[in-house]
Amino acid sequence: MQALVTGGAGFVGTNLIKRLLKEGHKVISLDNYSTGKKENEQDGCKYYELDLSSKSSLGSLDSISVVNQISKFDVIFHLAAKARIVPSIQNPKKSLFNNINSTINILEFVRKNNTPVVYAGSSSSHGDIYANPYTFTKWNGEELCKLYSNVYNLPTTICRFYNVYGDHQLTDGAYCTVLGVFERLHQMGNKEETLHMLVIS
């Protein structure tokens, strides 16, 4: 199988690529390296630095396919996004522009050859989608996938991730996960509330 992974140098993308390579699949990664890291790159995967939200990304995707002699990817895992709620509140334009346009460009690319797309949604979409720009963009991405599936019969799958943690997660900077730096959590409420966590490995 020939797979394309967007956000392949990030936390979830790195773990996915490791699994795909282990199973013997061919993998190409696209990442703008805004949060993805070069040290996450895996032997056996081809990495391309590309801003999927830019107008030129569709032409770049076509060029990558030609260079690698790929007439059609078997599946595209669209993980790339400006993640986290607080940064999206601080810079809404950046999150809105990047997350929405990159999803549109991926869907336009695959519309030509009906490639299945797996979209990385967010559990935050279960709540108030207008609570913050990040949640809105992830919900919007789901709706775009549904639109292209309905109008163009494009095979799409939406995965809503819940509080992910594991190998290759961000452990530095202002917005790293609490688990990543092993900070003790202060439990609030009646101490009977639960939080769903998803291990990525």
Which residues are covered by each model-predicted region?
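NAD(P)-dependent short-chain dehydrogenase/reductase
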Residues: 133-135, 139, 143-201
